[in-house]
């Protein structure tokens, strides 16, 4: 309520883990990775009655690594956010803070991520699936089904080529990797975790599990 927000002499300040007005709402860190963003960051703002709609005070950007995960970006933005909060409060106290209204026409909103969101749709392009895997690492994790059991996929790369097989089909099995056909291109699985087992590199997984190029993921 407005009366609560107006109680403190300097108003209320919030730290949001995105470059507002993009990614308002819940789980902005994971969504930035899932959406394949190259840059993310932290914004401090003066709170108003909307959801992440208040005037911006300070921003700091960070360039995402090609293999950035939701977990690694969380760690980066946590450190940046803590320092930016201190700087913001100091500027407010000194009377030097600048309040910049958000361009609401450029706003994007994201929602909560639930465990079921991690179920991989193999009809999607390999690049989208690879981003999903990174964004949901470590929680709730991306997963598929293999012979009726849950198979979590912790790390994967987009691979060259196309097997022309059905989406989700195992296209090739090598000594240390599994190549899966997607709706667009191949995905190379590098680290997996079968239901009831520990997380392991694909070469270790293949030493204990017989996977053939006639198998289908998602079943």
Please annotate each region the language model reported.
Residues 5, 19-20, 51, 64, ...:
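Generic detector of leucine side chains in alpha-helical contexts
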Residues 12, 54-57, 121, 150, ...:
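A residue-level structural signature of the nucleotidyltransferase/glycosyltransferase Rossmann-like core
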Residues 22-26, 122, 198:
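Alpha-helix N-cap/helix-start motif
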Residues 16-18, 29-31, 91-94, 114-117, ...:
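N-terminal start-of-chain detector that recognizes signal peptides
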Residues 123-219:
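An anion-binding loop in the catalytic cleft
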Residues 1-109, 114-116:
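Donor/substrate-binding cores of folate-linked one-carbon enzymes
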